């Protein structure tokens, strides 16, 4: 993609097939599903079955803390949802939108570990076309998917917006920013975020074109909740400059976490990642 000239990319985006289809091919890499959801005879209870590729790292006891179900989006797709009760006394629940090359099965162990360490429950979902979710991944479906997840989290579990932390990682920052720009929540965490699709492909892009996809840079200033941005300084996929640019546009930014030497897929392996999240959840949110 980076070998294309600016004019060639403009032609690619502006001519058939439509920009949304181009964006989908470039941004979404759904893996072969690493789990299945089996519904019981009543049609109300779903059982999670993980494949070996999910790399489950805990016992069956921890797995029992995971509740899964399906919900329908405004665009007609059925998406898989996962609620991980890490901490019964948790004040906050993370609405977690994952990266572009994983599904809920692969993320389930990470959710257990993260939630138990920062004292939060975690609600996540698979994008259309990922895991057990129907349909195909697209920018429009991303927004419909997170809307359906937001509604399910609030209605099924009775969790109020002021107790929800909207968390997006990589491509997951796109639906997260869109949702947070429309609804207030306890806070927003953006992990390795992008400013827009064009700016990822062409770092010198200074404005948002009509054919651009995923325009976080134009939406982030509408977020009224506190925003924590986390980015690796050596990110080889989404340059560190994207995190900086978004930080500068925030209405209510908190102290960001720039992880020295971290790339795109290893930020969470650095000790300061968990320390910053613990501080943010346990101390800073209380005073914001």
Swiss-Prot record:
It catalyses: S-hexadecanoyl-L-cysteinyl-[protein] + H2O = L-cysteinyl-[protein] + hexadecanoate + H(+). InterPro entries: AB_hydrolase_fold, Hydrolase_4. Its main location: membrane. The active site is at residues 170, 235, 264. Coiled coil: none annotated. Its EC number is 3.1.2.22. Keywords: Cell membrane, Cell projection, Endosome, Hydrolase, Lipoprotein, Membrane, Palmitate, Postsynaptic cell membrane, Synapse. It is a lipid-anchor. GO terms for molecular function: palmitoyl-(protein) hydrolase activity. Pfam families: Hydrolase_4. Palmitoylated on cysteine residues located in a cysteine cluster at the N-terminus which promotes membrane localization. Transmembrane segments: none annotated. It is found in: Cell membrane; Recycling endosome membrane; Cell projection, Dendritic spine; Postsynaptic density membrane. The keyword Hydrolase applies. GO terms for cellular component: dendritic spine; endosome membrane; plasma membrane; postsynaptic density membrane; recycling endosome membrane. Signal peptide: none annotated. The keyword Disulfide bond does not apply. Belongs to the AB hydrolase superfamily. ABHD17 family. This is Alpha/beta hydrolase domain-containing protein 17B. It comes from Xenopus laevis.
């Amino acid at each position: 993609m980076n070998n294309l000239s600016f004019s060639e990319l403009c032609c690619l985006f502006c001519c058939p097939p439509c920009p949304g289809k181009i964006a989908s091919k470039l941004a979404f890499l759904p893996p072969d599903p690493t789990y299945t959801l089996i519904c019981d005879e009543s049609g109300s209870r779903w059982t999670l079955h993980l494949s070996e590729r999910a790399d489950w790292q805990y016992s069956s006891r921890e797995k029992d803390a995971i509740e899964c179900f399906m919900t329908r989006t405004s665009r007609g797709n059925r998406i898989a949802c996962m609620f991980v009760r890490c901490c019964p006394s948790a004040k906050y629940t993370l609405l977690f939108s994952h990266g572009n090359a994983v599904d809920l099965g692969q993320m389930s162990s990470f959710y257990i570990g993260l939630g138990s360490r920062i004292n939060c429950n975690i609600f996540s979902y698979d994008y259309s076309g990922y895991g057990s979710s129907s349909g195909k991944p697209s920018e429009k479906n991303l927004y419909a998917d997170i809307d359906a997840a937001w509604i399910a989290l609030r209605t099924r579990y009775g969790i109020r917006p002021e107790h929800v932390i909207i968390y997006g990682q990589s491509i997951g920052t796109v639906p997260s920013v869109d949702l947070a720009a429309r609804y207030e929540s306890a806070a927003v965490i953006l992990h390795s975020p992008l400013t827009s699709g064009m700016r990822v492909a062409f770092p010198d892009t200074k404005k948002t074109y009509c054919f651009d996809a995923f325009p976080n840079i134009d939406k982030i200033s509408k977020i009224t909740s506190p925003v924590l941005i986390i980015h690796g300084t050596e990110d080889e996929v989404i340059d560190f400059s994207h995190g900086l640019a978004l930080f500068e546009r925030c209405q209510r930014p908190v102290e960001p976490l720039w992880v020295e030497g971290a790339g795109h897929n290893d930020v969470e392996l650095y000790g300061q990642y968990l320390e910053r999240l613990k501080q943010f959840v346990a101390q800073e949110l209380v005073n914001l």
